[in-house]
């Protein structure tokens, strides 16, 4: 019945997502020298959408002879407060230089140079060495544009403006065998039937009042894997970038002013004109890690020392207008578009939801704990621990995307394409079509409620009372989702897609809240007002969350200190 009514595309490798991870996975698999079919599915348009393209700052890699893998590793673990998966973090660090070389020599990327022709590397917060490779302040555009060109030049199939609605099981419920896909333009379903599936949609904490990711991001991959039964890790760890632009009355508030500004010397001030980071981080000041700077800014705002629009000021003019205009042309232009003069004056900024450190639990081959399912990029957890260093994000995506492509290409040969469960498909379609044409609640007030509640209860600072209240709000909103009505046809129905987004954001929000309740300490991006100190004795461990019989279940496990212990580097 299903095959007669819904188109089925058969493929060897299904890649959900077309950012740094998805494109690198496709290229590595295509270049593996094996005759395999590859299908990329993306909500946006390949090369034009997603978070990787939005990367401004750069890409961390050990290239200078005076730098070392061990230094980058220590910086990454200190930044992550030592709950990183050390095996994954080490893979990131040793493979990042390989990927930079590959992107330049094989894929056509070109990064900024020093006068001697070597790759220029700039300073970023939380790092002991200047190791951030960049293309001006528009690094992501360079990387994604070149990767997309390479994908178009190979025998790789792709579907733009299509979204995965749910991962599909085989009839025995033992393997993931693809996904149910919705053609966003036509409003019609198809089935991507696959031997192996990679989830790398990009995270997207857009369930907060202020957020940095592109509007098409809604924690899709994380929610898909969670509902399929995959284990998740570190979901309490949500990064808030310190400098999201405040644009009064605009939905673009939250868009980033990149970390390189602070790395180069930009300073932060409260409304009283005080350079407040001198109080919170006397040594590092504005170059402290993102969690420290965001929390410091937030505390200034809460204490009544914020700007008229609820932020703080960033002052880049202290570096000299000519320096700012030369080194940060993208940021200068963006601010000019909104009537702000970044090179000559102070600009209002606020902490903004930016990145999930948590995600699907994977091994060093990007395999999840579900047969046939891989994850990479922001959808995968464990690499960054409690806080991601700026510059490690796009490195993570391209490094582990490549690893996933290699792994899938090696493992797909001889793997049987087993039938999918048609009953599951019918049930999913019934669920997601339910709001169409139904008289009911308006979706958008529910979304506004979620964003405000998460900002206040599951945000930069937390406590038990607020977390419980936030989780209660999430449960109430989940109940109301069954009462939402969506008007209009199926074709290009933005409200229907926003309903699907909201469904995923609610699942991700619940995982954040439940995991945050369990961690009764403060560590990295997770700050508890009722437990303000780090507690290595009891909480040097990871929390895992898994859906069992329709309900979330929490597990915990001590961190595997396989390469480095906190005391080895004086981290107490």
Please give the residue ranges for each predicted region:
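Glycine- and aromatic-enriched mobile tails/lids
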Residues: 1-4, 9-11, 20, 28, ...
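Core beta-strand elements of the Rossmann-like FAD/NAD(P) dinucleotide-binding domain
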Residues: 8-11, 186-196, 369
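N-terminal Rossmann-like FAD-binding beta1-loop-alpha1 element of flavoenzymes
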Residues: 13-40
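Conserved N-terminal glycine-rich FAD pyrophosphate-binding loop of Rossmann-like flavoproteins
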Residues: 44-77, 81, 239-243, 252-253
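Short beta-strand to alpha-helix junction loop
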Residues: 84-97, 131-149, 159, 211-219, ...
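Conserved redox-cofactor binding core of oxidoreductases
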Residues: 104-188, 193, 200, 244-248, ...
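Glycine-/small-residue-rich beta->alpha transition segments that form the dinucleotide
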Residues: 194-196, 200-205, 379-380
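An anion/pyrophosphate-binding glycine-rich loop and adjacent beta-alpha core
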Residues: 224, 230-341, 345, 407-414
């Amino acid at each position: 019945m299903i095959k007669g009514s819904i188109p089925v595309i058969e493929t060897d490798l299904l890649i959900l997502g077309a950012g740094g991870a998805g494109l690198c996975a496709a290229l590595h698999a295509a270049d593996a020298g094996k005759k395999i079919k590859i299908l990329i599915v993306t909500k946006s348009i390949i090369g034009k959408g997603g978070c990787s393209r939005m990367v401004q700052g750069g890409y961390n890699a050990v290239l200078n002879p005076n730098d070392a893998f061990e230094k980058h590793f220590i910086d990454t673990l200190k930044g992550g407060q030592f709950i990183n998966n050390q095996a994954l973090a080490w893979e990131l660090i040793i493979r990042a230089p390989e990927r930079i070389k590959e992107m330049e020599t094989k894929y056509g990327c070109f990064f900024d140079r020093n006068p001697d022709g070597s790759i220029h590397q700039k300073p970023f917060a939380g790092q002991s060495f200047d190791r951030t490779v960049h293309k001006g302040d528009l690094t992501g555009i360079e990387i994604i544009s070149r990767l997309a060109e390479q994908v178009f030049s190979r025998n790789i199939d792709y579907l733009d403006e299509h979204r995965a609605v749910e991962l599909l099981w085989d009839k025995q419920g033992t393997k993931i065998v693809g996904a149910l896909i919705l053609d966003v333009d036509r409003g019609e379903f198809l089935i991507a039937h696959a031997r192996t599936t990679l989830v790398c949609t990009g995270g997207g904490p857009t369930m907060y009042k202020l957020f940095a990711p592109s509007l098409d991001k809604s924690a899709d991959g994380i929610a898909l894997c969670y509902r399929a039964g995959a284990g998740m890790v570190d979901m309490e760890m949500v990064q808030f970038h310190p400098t999201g632009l405040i644009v009064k009355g605009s939905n673009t508030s939250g868009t980033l002013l990149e970390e390189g500004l602070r790395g180069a010397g930009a300073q932060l001030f409260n409304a009283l004109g005080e350079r407040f980071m001198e109080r919170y981080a006397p040594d590092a000041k504005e170059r402290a890690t993102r969690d420290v700077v965001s929390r410091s800014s937030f505390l200034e705002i809460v204490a009544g020392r914020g700007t008229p629009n609820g932020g703080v000021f960033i002052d880049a003019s202290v570096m000299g207008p000519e320096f700012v205009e030369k080194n940060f042309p993208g940021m200068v232009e963006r601010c000019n578009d909104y009537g702000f003069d970044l090179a000559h004056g102070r600009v209002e900024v606020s902490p903004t939801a930016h990145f999930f450190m948590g995600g699907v639990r994977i091994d060093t081959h990007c395999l999840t704990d579900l047969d046939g399912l891989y994850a990479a990029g922001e959808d995968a957890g464990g690499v960054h621990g409690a806080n991601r260093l700026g510059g490690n994000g796009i490195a993570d995506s391209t490094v582990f995307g490549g690893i996933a492509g290699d792994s899938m290409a090696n493992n797909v040969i001889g793997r049987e394409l087993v039938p999918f469960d048609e009953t599951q498909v019918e049930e999913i379609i019934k669920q997601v079509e339910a709001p169409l044409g139904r008289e009911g609640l308006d979706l958008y007030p529910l979304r506004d409620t979620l964003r405000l509640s998460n900002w206040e209860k599951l945000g930069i600072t937390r406590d038990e009372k607020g977390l419980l209240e936030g989780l209660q709000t999430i449960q109430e909103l989940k109940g109301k989702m069954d009462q939402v009505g969506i008007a209009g046809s199926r074709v290009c129905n933005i409200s229907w897609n926003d309903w699907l987004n909201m469904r995923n954001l609610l699942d991700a929000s619940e995982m954040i809240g439940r995991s945050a309740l369990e961690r009764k300490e403060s560590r990295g991006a997770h700050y508890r007002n009722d437990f303000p100190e780090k507690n290595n004795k009891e909480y040097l461990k990871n929390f895992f969350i898994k859906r069992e019989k329709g309900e979330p279940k929490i597990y915990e496990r001590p961190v595997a200190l396989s390469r480095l212990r906190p005391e080895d580097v004086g981290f107490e």
